[in-house]
Amino acid sequence: SMEDAVNHYRDLPAGEEEAPRINYWGYKKGYYFAPKMSYSSSDCPAEEFKDMVKQLHQNGIEVIMQFYFPVDVKRAYILEVIKYWVFSCHVDGFHLLGVHIPTALLATEPMLGNTKLFYTDFSCDEIYDNSDIPAYKNLAVYNDDFMYAVRHFLKSDEGSLLPALGSLRKNPRQTGVINY
Protein backbone atom coordinates (compact mmCIF):
# COMPACT_ATOMS: atom_id res chain seq x y z
CA SER A 1 0.00 0.00 0.00
CA MET A 2 1.05 3.62 -0.49
CA GLU A 3 1.17 4.23 3.27
CA ASP A 4 4.12 1.87 3.50
CA ALA A 5 5.81 2.97 0.28
CA VAL A 6 7.26 6.36 1.29
CA ASN A 7 9.22 6.85 4.51
CA HIS A 8 11.24 9.96 3.73
CA TYR A 9 11.36 12.95 1.45
CA ARG A 10 14.81 13.95 0.23
CA ASP A 11 15.22 17.50 -0.98
CA LEU A 12 17.88 18.68 -3.40
CA PRO A 13 19.90 21.64 -2.13
CA ALA A 14 17.10 24.05 -1.23
CA GLY A 15 19.10 27.10 -0.16
CA GLU A 16 18.79 30.36 -2.03
CA GLU A 17 21.56 31.06 -4.52
CA GLU A 18 23.58 34.25 -4.84
CA ALA A 19 22.35 35.02 -8.39
CA PRO A 20 19.27 33.48 -10.02
CA ARG A 21 20.18 30.85 -12.61
CA ILE A 22 18.18 28.73 -15.01
CA ASN A 23 18.46 24.95 -14.53
CA TYR A 24 20.45 25.41 -11.35
CA TRP A 25 20.45 22.45 -8.99
CA GLY A 26 22.12 24.08 -5.98
CA TYR A 27 25.51 22.36 -6.05
CA LYS A 28 27.49 25.55 -5.47
CA LYS A 29 27.95 27.87 -2.53
CA GLY A 30 24.74 29.64 -1.57
CA TYR A 31 22.71 31.16 1.23
CA TYR A 32 22.46 28.09 3.41
CA PHE A 33 20.04 29.58 5.94
CA ALA A 34 17.45 30.77 3.40
CA PRO A 35 14.99 28.41 1.68
CA LYS A 36 14.90 28.92 -2.07
CA MET A 37 12.28 31.55 -2.93
CA SER A 38 11.36 29.95 -6.26
CA TYR A 39 10.24 26.78 -4.43
CA SER A 40 7.67 28.81 -2.52
CA SER A 41 4.20 29.91 -3.56
CA SER A 42 4.21 32.80 -1.08
CA ASP A 43 6.49 35.60 0.06
CA CYS A 44 7.40 33.55 3.15
CA PRO A 45 9.48 30.58 1.96
CA ALA A 46 10.80 29.80 5.46
CA GLU A 47 7.29 29.49 6.91
CA GLU A 48 6.12 27.50 3.90
CA PHE A 49 9.06 25.11 4.28
CA LYS A 50 8.32 24.62 7.98
CA ASP A 51 4.66 23.93 7.18
CA MET A 52 5.71 21.37 4.56
CA VAL A 53 7.94 19.59 7.08
CA LYS A 54 5.11 19.58 9.63
CA GLN A 55 2.68 18.08 7.08
CA LEU A 56 5.18 15.43 6.03
CA HIS A 57 5.82 14.49 9.66
CA GLN A 58 2.07 14.22 10.31
CA ASN A 59 2.00 11.65 7.50
CA GLY A 60 4.92 9.66 8.90
CA ILE A 61 7.45 10.95 6.36
CA GLU A 62 10.91 12.14 7.43
CA VAL A 63 12.62 15.07 5.73
CA ILE A 64 16.21 14.64 4.53
CA MET A 65 17.92 17.69 3.03
CA GLN A 66 20.85 17.60 0.69
CA PHE A 67 23.62 20.17 1.10
CA TYR A 68 26.76 20.76 -0.91
CA PHE A 69 29.58 22.52 0.93
CA PRO A 70 32.65 23.59 -1.09
CA VAL A 71 36.11 23.25 0.44
CA ASP A 72 36.25 26.91 1.55
CA VAL A 73 33.20 26.66 3.85
CA LYS A 74 34.40 26.60 7.46
CA ARG A 75 33.70 23.58 9.67
CA ALA A 76 31.98 25.63 12.39
CA TYR A 77 29.74 27.25 9.77
CA ILE A 78 28.66 23.84 8.43
CA LEU A 79 27.75 22.81 11.99
CA GLU A 80 25.66 25.97 12.44
CA VAL A 81 23.84 25.40 9.14
CA ILE A 82 22.93 21.84 10.11
CA LYS A 83 21.81 22.86 13.61
CA TYR A 84 19.69 25.68 12.16
CA TRP A 85 17.70 23.35 9.89
CA VAL A 86 17.24 20.78 12.66
CA PHE A 87 16.06 23.19 15.34
CA SER A 88 14.34 25.84 13.25
CA CYS A 89 12.65 23.63 10.65
CA HIS A 90 12.68 20.18 12.34
CA VAL A 91 14.53 18.47 9.49
CA ASP A 92 15.32 14.82 10.29
CA GLY A 93 18.59 14.36 8.45
CA PHE A 94 21.07 15.42 5.81
CA HIS A 95 22.74 13.99 2.73
CA LEU A 96 26.07 15.84 2.80
CA LEU A 97 28.12 16.50 -0.30
CA GLY A 98 31.60 17.97 -0.54
CA VAL A 99 35.19 16.98 0.03
CA HIS A 100 35.98 18.26 3.53
CA ILE A 101 32.76 17.71 5.46
CA PRO A 102 33.49 17.67 9.23
CA THR A 103 31.66 14.40 9.79
CA ALA A 104 33.28 13.71 13.17
CA LEU A 105 32.30 17.19 14.41
CA LEU A 106 28.71 16.72 13.24
CA ALA A 107 28.41 13.13 14.47
CA THR A 108 29.72 13.94 17.95
CA GLU A 109 27.61 17.08 18.45
CA PRO A 110 25.19 16.10 21.26
CA MET A 111 22.45 18.32 19.86
CA LEU A 112 22.48 16.25 16.64
CA GLY A 113 22.40 12.83 18.31
CA ASN A 114 19.08 11.89 16.69
CA THR A 115 19.80 13.53 13.33
CA LYS A 116 20.49 11.25 10.37
CA LEU A 117 23.71 12.02 8.51
CA PHE A 118 24.44 10.47 5.12
CA TYR A 119 27.90 10.83 3.55
CA THR A 120 30.39 8.89 1.46
CA ASP A 121 32.43 7.81 4.50
CA PHE A 122 32.76 8.30 8.25
CA SER A 123 35.91 8.00 10.34
CA CYS A 124 34.34 5.91 13.08
CA ASP A 125 37.59 5.96 15.09
CA GLU A 126 37.08 9.72 15.61
CA ILE A 127 33.40 9.31 16.45
CA TYR A 128 33.13 6.23 18.66
CA ASP A 129 35.31 4.77 21.42
CA ASN A 130 36.97 1.56 20.26
CA SER A 131 34.29 -0.75 18.93
CA ASP A 132 31.27 0.89 20.55
CA ILE A 133 28.00 0.11 18.83
CA PRO A 134 25.70 3.14 18.84
CA ALA A 135 22.28 2.73 20.44
CA TYR A 136 20.84 4.72 17.52
CA LYS A 137 22.52 4.22 14.15
CA ASN A 138 22.12 7.71 12.69
CA LEU A 139 25.12 7.62 10.33
CA ALA A 140 24.86 6.04 6.90
CA VAL A 141 27.40 5.61 4.12
CA TYR A 142 26.37 6.01 0.48
CA ASN A 143 27.70 2.88 -1.22
CA ASP A 144 28.03 3.18 -4.98
CA ASP A 145 30.23 0.03 -5.01
CA PHE A 146 26.93 -1.85 -4.81
CA MET A 147 25.73 -0.35 -8.09
CA TYR A 148 28.85 -1.37 -9.99
CA ALA A 149 29.07 -4.84 -8.43
CA VAL A 150 25.44 -5.66 -9.17
CA ARG A 151 25.69 -4.35 -12.74
CA HIS A 152 28.63 -6.69 -13.38
CA PHE A 153 26.74 -9.57 -11.77
CA LEU A 154 23.60 -8.94 -13.85
CA LYS A 155 25.72 -8.96 -17.01
CA SER A 156 27.23 -12.30 -15.86
CA ASP A 157 30.75 -10.88 -15.88
CA GLU A 158 33.48 -13.28 -14.81
CA GLY A 159 34.26 -13.07 -11.08
CA SER A 160 31.30 -10.83 -10.28
CA LEU A 161 29.48 -13.02 -7.75
CA LEU A 162 31.71 -12.40 -4.71
CA PRO A 163 31.83 -8.59 -5.09
CA ALA A 164 28.03 -8.49 -5.52
CA LEU A 165 27.48 -10.68 -2.45
CA GLY A 166 29.98 -8.61 -0.48
CA SER A 167 28.07 -5.44 -1.29
CA LEU A 168 24.75 -7.04 -0.38
CA ARG A 169 26.08 -8.36 2.94
CA LYS A 170 27.89 -5.17 3.96
CA ASN A 171 26.51 -4.16 7.34
CA PRO A 172 29.05 -2.30 9.51
CA ARG A 173 28.50 -2.20 13.26
CA GLN A 174 28.65 1.58 13.60
CA THR A 175 27.02 2.94 10.43
CA GLY A 176 24.23 2.06 8.10
CA VAL A 177 24.76 1.53 4.38
CA ILE A 178 22.67 3.00 1.59
CA ASN A 179 23.13 0.93 -1.55
CA TYR A 180 22.31 2.61 -4.82
Give the ranges of each region predicted by the language model:
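Structural recognition of alpha->loop->beta junctions
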Residues: 84-94, 137, 144-148
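Active-site-proximal loop/turn and secondary-structure-junction residues that shape catalytic pockets
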Residues: 3-4, 38, 67-71, 100, ...
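Conserved alpha/beta catalytic core and glycan-binding cleft of carbohydrate-active enzymes
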Residues: 107-180
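Secondary-structure transition/capping motifs at alpha-helix termini
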Residues: 55-64, 86-92, 108-114
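Hydrophobic faces of well-ordered beta-strands that scaffold small-molecule active sites
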Residues: 1, 63-65, 94, 117-119
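Active-site-adjacent beta->alpha loops and helix N-cap segments on the catalytic face
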Residues: 46, 101-106
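Aromatic- and acidic-residue-enriched carbohydrate-binding clefts of CAZyme catalytic domains
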Residues: 5-58, 71-88
